[in-house]
Amino acid sequence: MNPNQKILCTSATAIVIGTIAVLIGVANLGLNIGLHLKPNCNCSHSQPEATNTSQTIINNYYNETNITQISNTNIQMEERASRDFNNLTKGLCTINSWHIYGKDNAVRIGENSDVLVTREPYVSCDPDECRFYALSQGTTIRGKHSNGTIHDRSQYRALISWPLSSPPTVYNSRVECIGWSSTSCHDGKSRMSICISGPNNNASAVVWYNRRPVAEINTWARNILRTQESECVCHNGVCPVVFTDGSATGPADTRVYYFKEGKILKWESLTGTAKHIEECSCYGERTGITCTCRDNWQGSNRPVIQIDPVAMTHTSQYICSPVLTDNPRPNDPNVGKCNDPYPGNNNNGVKGFSYLDGVNTWLGRTISTVSRSGYEMLKVPNALTDDRSKPIQGQTIVLNTDWSGYSGSFMDYWAEGDCYRACFYVELIRGRPKEDKVWWTSNSIVSMCSSTEFLGQWNWPDGAKIEYFL
């Protein structure tokens, strides 16, 4: 074959191969266009629609990452749909001491980061995780709007949650509902959150379930409708919640509402011998729910509401022990009161908690009798029923030289084991009114859980230096 023939042969071969490549490309383009222009295709949406799985797969058949995410979402939704209501079948674990569980250092970190102003914090768990909760003030500590956040009620407050032991920031916080008083709990299938908002004489509560509003409750006494400021507890889908509407320094109207999937099953007016109820801290075990509350009117001893979520009934009394746990309070007397308030709190108080379990009973309280400083846990056997019971063991959580605040109970009802591990948190308030060189009022959180071991103790203060904010 002469050179000219070789050139012609090579050229012809190249032309044939090129033509085939062009035809393949055209066919591929046509196939893509055909798939994307199928009937019922919503071609104006480039992002996957989670509510339409088949459409999402069509729009993103070429993107393995999106398909994986859709599959994971579907699996999670199926898992949640197959979950059962939580039942309170276990008792409390033996409590010999308390170990550190979580600490967010929110005020320290907020000195140079976008940390939100909060108060009234708590902890609540679900089958997947435990999270910190609090009422945000709609501003950061360093923001100019933090001026005036000493006030409890405003249009800018919201119940937020964020990962355990992280500070609440504008980037990691999830808004649960809007309001200045709250409670929240998980029934095993989904979470119920309740927020109260509105003016003092016309407040109302909105009940959210599975991140949707389900029910509303209007004020009945037109005097600051309010609720627990810590987690509620559910048994077989029934979630009791304690509300109060009325005077903080006189008789008030307290009710126990029973919810299921956010819907109101019934409500009862307060029964028993408790005279005033606010800000209850609740826990559940052996099908019962126990709430330790605040008598802001008269009692330095704490009222207790015991709830039967099966019968949807309750009763109330005071902790009998002479170990007084409200603040302010007088010195501990020799004999306590089971059915009447022990005087000396001067129309004031602070949210608190206890674990009332016979000889396994522990009470929490500020160390100071006159201010919200220090915090200690005291083992007081049979404190609920014995009016002469005294501490036999204790553990300091926060030294009296450091500020404390509200405290409350919580438990991880989904943790493995044959008993429920008791846990609590302490609010570490900083800023006004005690530290009035700054314009804001906020807090950090420390939380502890029970141990069967006899562990050592340590001081767990907020740790922020106010002078760094000046």
Report the location of each language-model feature.
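Beta-propeller blade signature
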Residues: 156-163, 255-258, 304-308, 377-379, ...
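Blade-level signature of beta-propeller repeat domains, shared across WD40, Kelch, NHL, RCC1
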Residues: 409-416, 420-470
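Entry beta-strands of beta-propeller and related beta-repeat scaffolds
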Residues: 129-134, 190-192, 203-205, 238-241, ...
